């Protein structure tokens, strides 16, 4: 069992007789006699299930003046005019199914705005209900997330310790590589000079105050042996001479 729900109530609305539409440009409220409305009364927008009806009623007695069933919005049943936001063209129907088009006007723009919002919300709800019913009847397609035959995937894993640092192999690698090559063995020592140069440097350093002319010869020991040998030979000759003389 469905219950009626009142979506909106406006205590005062105006109804106008409108001329036939001259072209496809739409209705214009400026073509109506706005100062002399045909009828003035109350408007109620009532929903029953997915159906919604705009009812025009007497202010005092609540007697029904006209019904405007609305099957879609915007649509033929209710249409906004092209020159004002406060006026609409509605299609009213009697119990015999006869219909007529009338002009509907509000004294304030906020009233027409409320009617727009109420109709939009209702038909949005109807659309959602239809979608829910459609999902119930149609089987839902399940996604196949399994691997197909011959399909492989590649996973890159980065294992970390509990303290947040990386593995030991990578840590040791990072610590050992500082980015600077070590020096070659013995690279920091001086190159040894040749033996002759070393001896000359040693002689100069030991006797800095002796001139080259007074410096003793390098082969001093050999010269002494030679001189002593010559002296001994002279002594032997003199001895021989003395022996002859004797």
Curated annotation (Swiss-Prot):
Pfam families: DUF1681 (PF07933). May be involved in endocytosis. Belongs to the NECAP family. The keyword Iron-sulfur does not apply. GO terms for biological process: endocytosis; protein transport; vesicle-mediated transport. It comes from Drosophila melanogaster (Fruit fly). GO terms for cellular component: clathrin vesicle coat; clathrin-coated pit. Residues 166-177 have a biased composition (Polar residues). The keyword Protein transport applies. Residues 156-246 are annotated as: Disordered. Keywords: Endocytosis, Protein transport, Transport. Gene3D superfamilies: Pleckstrin-homology domain (PH domain)/Phosphotyrosine-binding domain (PTB). A motif (WXXF motif) lies at residues 243-246. CDD domains: PHear_NECAP (cd13228). Residues 181-196 have a biased composition (Pro residues). This is NECAP-like protein CG9132. Signal peptide: none annotated. The WXXF motif mediates binding with the GAE domain of proteins. Residues 227-246 have a biased composition (Low complexity).
